[in-house]
């Protein structure tokens, strides 16, 4: 029997084997909302599975965004978006300690360039007060320029929100998923949902890897959430992918501003921001372009020009020669501009977690709570006595004292071998990223967990060495290693037998 026939037989057997797998809850999507819901549900005695069409967690909206923990003044008063934003912000600091991911509460500024716009700034302040945002103040021209000397001279005032912060979206998403997995949640990657059917009280989730049965479905599919909602409900929703372009600057530019700087919000969002990142870079963006393509994450010349022009309106002397990469992400914009987190009225057992755009990252811990509370009430779930609430991230030797680092290297010499020179990432960190729960399987998976390849050379130096480690640890040929799963292979084949 040839290789193709064997592969077909294997897939048929796999589908047959998986067909009658039964869960209490299946979550569609391993982005930050799905992972947060999974982590909260892992507190209870329920059989939970997360199904993800990509090869890893954090491969959609959650991987390409502004990485801002918003204060909560922008969302409409009384909206679910406002409530979960403020709650998520309040939860983030303790969560970062429990799950060991980087978070900094640096504060944000919404700047005003014209006295005629002061009523709009005051309205934003008033909305924030109603939403329960702590510590809001309107700063004078002198105060704001003392706080941020690189602001443009014509800025006359600013709304200061000290509770705003910055986070690493990769580490947040990965930490939530890892902790959920350690507490018993299953994750199925490279598994694409193709259909949803109801048989009595049981949902059948049809995928390219088989059929899974569950009592409840949580639809946390990002820009695809409308697709799955509309499969099961007569009341349709529509989600527009809203593309945002970004520029990322080298760490040498990271101190150009010390707060997140916003323009006054407009129809399409919060405008072009300028912000330091938790890792010391400077981030500019995003644009807000509505598109049809749910995979349309290509950058455009026009979009990047808009990012640069928008950033330069509010901050002077931005060292644009220090741009090391650009990227684009998609926001899941629902027509009503509101989070939809509820059981679908005409599809019992189907829970929407849809329309999760900004401030979705900030809100994710609160979204997880809300989804779990909905299901806890319906399923009468009992809390586990052995729930593990904490998690340790990939060890960074640079955070250790000289004595601690020496002891670590003596025990594990791989922590002395620098693989990524730009970010000073060691072989030991990469091995940890691969071996840990839900470990990295691709170059991008390693990058999200360790930052190997995120520095000035953008993996130009370290990618071959990272591929060697991935191949060795996974027991495969280097030609099987991908950039980001699927068909994104880097090596087509060996062109000389001697190699």
Positions of the model-derived regions?
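Glycine-rich FAD pyrophosphate-binding loop
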Residues: 42-64
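Dinucleotide-binding Rossmann-like beta1-alpha1 core, especially the glycine-rich loop
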Residues: 67-147, 271-272
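Iron-sulfur (Fe-S) cluster-binding segments and ferredoxin-like electron-carrier domains
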Residues: 295, 426-437, 460-478
């Amino acid at each position: 029997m040839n290789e193709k026939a064997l592969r077909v037989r294997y897939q048929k057997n796999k589908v047959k084997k998986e067909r009658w797998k039964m869960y209490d809850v299946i979550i569609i999507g391993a982005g930050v909302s799905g992972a947060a819901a999974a982590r909260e549900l892992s507190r209870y005695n329920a059989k939970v599975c997360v199904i993800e069409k990509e090869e890893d967690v954090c491969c959609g909206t959650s991987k390409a965004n502004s990485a801002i923990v918003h204060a909560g003044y922008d969302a409409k008063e009384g909206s679910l978006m406002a409530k979960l934003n403020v709650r998520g912000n309040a939860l983030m600091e303790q969560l970062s300690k429990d799950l060991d991911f980087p978070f900094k509460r640096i504060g944000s500024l919404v700047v005003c360039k014209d006295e005629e716009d002061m009523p709009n700034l005051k309205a934003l302040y008033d909305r924030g007060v109603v939403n329960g945002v702590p510590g809001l103040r309107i700063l004078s021209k002198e105060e704001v320029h003392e706080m941020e000397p690189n602001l443009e001279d014509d800025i006359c005032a600013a709304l200061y929100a000290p509770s705003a912060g910055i986070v690493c979206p990769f580490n947040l998403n990965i930490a939530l998923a890892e902790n959920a997995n350690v507490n018993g949640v299953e994750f199925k990657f490279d598994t694409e949902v193709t259909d949803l059917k109801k048989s009595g009280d049981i949902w059948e989730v049809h995928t390219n890897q088989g059929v899974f049965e569950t009592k409840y479905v949580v639809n946390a599919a990002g820009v695809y959430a409308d697709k799955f909602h509309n499969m099961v409900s007569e009341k349709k929703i529509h989600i527009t992918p809203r593309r945002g372009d970004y520029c990322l600057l080298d760490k040498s530019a990271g101190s150009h501003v010390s707060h997140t700087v916003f323009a006054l919000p407009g129809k399409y969002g919060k405008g072009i921001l300028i912000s330091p990142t938790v890792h010391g870079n400077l981030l500019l963006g995003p644009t807000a372009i509505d598109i049809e393509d749910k995979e349309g994450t290509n950058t455009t010349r026009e979009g990047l020009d808009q990012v640069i022009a928008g950033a330069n309106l509010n901050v002077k002397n931005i060292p644009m020669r220090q741009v090391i990469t650009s990227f684009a992400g998609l926001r899941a914009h629902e027509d009503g501009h509101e989070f939809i987190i509820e059981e679908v009225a005409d599809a019992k057992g189907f829970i929407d977690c849809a329309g999760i755009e900004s401030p979705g990252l900030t809100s994710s811990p609160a979204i997880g709570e809300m989804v779990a509370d909905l299901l806890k009430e319906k399923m009468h779930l009992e809390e586990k006595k052995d729930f593990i609430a904490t998690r340790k991230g990939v060890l960074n030797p640079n955070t250790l004292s000289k004595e601690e680092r020496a002891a670590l290297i003596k025990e594990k010499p791989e922590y002395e071998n620098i693989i990524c020179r730009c970010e000073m990432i060691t072989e030991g960190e990469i091995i940890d990223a691969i071996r840990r729960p839900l470990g990295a399987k691709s170059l991008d998976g390693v990058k999200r967990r360790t930052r190997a390849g995120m520095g000035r050379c953008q993996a130009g130096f370290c990618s071959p060495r990272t591929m060697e480690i991935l191949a060795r640890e996974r027991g495969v040929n280097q030609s099987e290693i991908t950039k980001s799963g699927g068909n994104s292979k880097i090596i087509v084949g060996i062109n000389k037998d001697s190699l």
